[in-house]
Structure formats: C-alpha cells, structure tokens
C-alpha cells in the first residue's frame, strides 16, 4: 500500500542508500495523542519499577514483553543511542515490540524439540535468564533471529503505511529484467533498505559501545540475521495483456514469511563455527587448529553450550525434567535423547477435540465433540544421590 504524503516523509527522514546512517530529526513538541499516550502509560512505568529488580543490566528484547508503548527513559538496559531512537520514533518502537514477539515465537518453534527450547522467563527483564551470558551457539542464534525480527517487522510496517517516516521502497523504479524477460517496477516493494538501516542503528548500538570480544560476536550474528531477511525477498508480478497473455509485467519485491528466515538461521545454528577473537580484538580466528574459518554468513560462538539435561541455575539451564517427549521418535524430540537417558513417565489423558464438522445453510459450521485417550510421555527428573540425607 503506497501512502500519500511522500514529500513530508522525505523531509522528516530522507531516504538514502543503505550505507547511510539513520537520520535523526530534531524532536518536535509532542502532539495531543503522544502526550496523552505518555500520561496513560505512567501506570505501566509504575508497574515496571515495582516488578523489576534493582539491577537493570538487560536489553531491548524486553520491549516485546512490555509492549513498545512505554516511557523510553525507563526501559531497563537501553543505551543512550537506543533511548534517543526510542523517543524520536515511538511508532517504530511499536514495530520493534511486535518484531520481538515474532522472533521469540519463531525461536520457540525452531527449538520446540530441542533440550534447550528457547524458554522465556516470566517477570524476568532479561527474557531468557542467565543462559544468554554464555557465548554459546544458542546465544548466537538468539542474537541473529532477534535482529532479523526487527528488520522484518519494520520493513513490513513501512510498506503497509503504518509508519510516518517511511513507505514503499523508493529504489525499485523503471525497467528491469529477470529470467522471464523485461518487466516494470511497480506496486509497493517492501522497503528492506529502511528496515535494515534502522535495525542496525538500534540493535547494534549497545554492542558498538562495549567493543569487547562478546560484542564483536554479537555484531557478527546481528548482521547474519539482517542478511537472512534480505536473502528471502521474493519477486511478485502481475501480468497485463489480452486474455492474460502477460505481454507486460509489473513487479515488486516482497518479504517472505518469517518462517523461511527462521528455518535458514536454524540451519546456520546447526553449522555454527566456534571461534576465538584475534589478539587485537578486531576479528575472529578458528578456535582450534584445523577448524574452518567463519564466513560472513556463519553464526559464530566462543563457548560450548551448558548441559541442558539438568537444572543449573548458574548456567541458566532449566533441565528437561517434565518435558513431553515422543516414545517412537529417534530424533531430538525422542524420549531417549530428550530425557538424557533418565527414562520417562507415561500418563494416560483424555483429549476433547471437534470432529465431523458439517456446514449448515446458512451460515454455520456444526461439529461433534470427540474424545480420544492418548498416552503422554514426560521426562523423569534426575535421581538424587542415595547418600544424601532425605530426612
């Protein structure tokens, strides 16, 4: 959807090439809607201050849990650059919040059959707990998909006319060609340039301040996530001509479903490269002699993953006790692997589902209730040492 008012948008935030920094206009006096929103969110701020612990070493991920409509100065863990962008672009922060929820859902989908299943912690402003403190391949995946989620959400919001500072991609103009022949750029191409630019400015801001080995790792994986979204842009076209002869085509670029990005990054996780920082701290080298060097599309990590089989609060592992597993599967969702050899309990449960649905004119669908009894298998907890005093 191409929104009117392009000249006004250009005045607020000129669209430049992807390498250009995100321009920041001088803050204007808040209008009535913004002022009322700030007043209405004072209650949310109070709740935030009451529920969060005193330590606020966290990240922008919490925006997805809080929602973007918060007072930017009081979101824990934002660095000054992120606060500036939050204050000046509150509508984009709404997209950042939506993107955070989207990538967390995707992370949980990708690892639903894994010992570590991307569990978020309620009332924990770090979102994932201590597990992200380790520079593991799980941390590499989370940073990559979080960056990708922001790009995807902002890009989509631009072309749907939800943001005042961007609209359709201004670079897809004129004639072009592909394997099928020539076509004209038209319609509303998704503005991936703006999405990547803003995501880089906002998400990378904290890591660019720190400038240590972990920050270097995070920046690399953030870039992998942004690149993954761009990788799956697709060309959509409409034919023009007599009886659909397609003598002329009008085409535009569109985002693919975020699942494709998630699937790709999961494959990158499986092939992630263990590295170590060079002495000058400016690059990576292979962690051990004989290991392959990381490329720009590889996820990288420093540390081996903790043992996710057992509860380990210090490492952030929740263990697999109580996790549902498949008795017949030989994969990571199978009881043998998921339960780490501890065995499993079986519970017989009755599930009620709708079945034999029929359409009745007009206009209703009526279904019967069907009851199915199934066996649910859950992992046993680790046995306590026999020498421990049980009294």
From Swiss-Prot:
Localisation per UniProt entry: Secreted, Extracellular space, Extracellular matrix; Secreted
Sugar-bearing residue positions: 117, 283
O-palmitoleoyl serine-type lipidated residues: 243
Presence of the UniProt keyword Glycoprotein in the record: yes
GO molecular-function terms, A-Z: cytokine activity; frizzled binding
Main subcellular localisation: secreted
Keywords: Developmental protein, Disease variant, Disulfide bond, Extracellular matrix, Glycoprotein, Lipoprotein, Secreted, Signal, Wnt signaling pathway
Cystine crosslinks: 107-118, 158-166, 168-188, 237-251, 239-246, 309-340, 325-335, 339-379, 355-370, 357-367, 362-363
Modification note: Palmitoleoylation is required for efficient binding to frizzled receptors. Depalmitoleoylation leads to Wnt signaling pathway inhibition.
GO BP term, example: forebrain regionalization
Disease implication from the record: Diarrhea 9: An autosomal recessive form of chronic diarrhea characterized by neonatal-onset of osmotic diarrhea that is not substrate specific, abnormal crypt and villus architecture, and significant fat malabsorption evidenced by high levels of fecal fat.
Quaternary structure note: Forms a soluble 1:1 complex with AFM; this prevents oligomerization and is required for prolonged biological activity. The complex with AFM may represent the physiological form in body fluids. Interacts with FZD4 and FZD5.
Protein name as annotated: Protein Wnt-2b
Organism: Homo sapiens (Human)
Gene: WNT2B
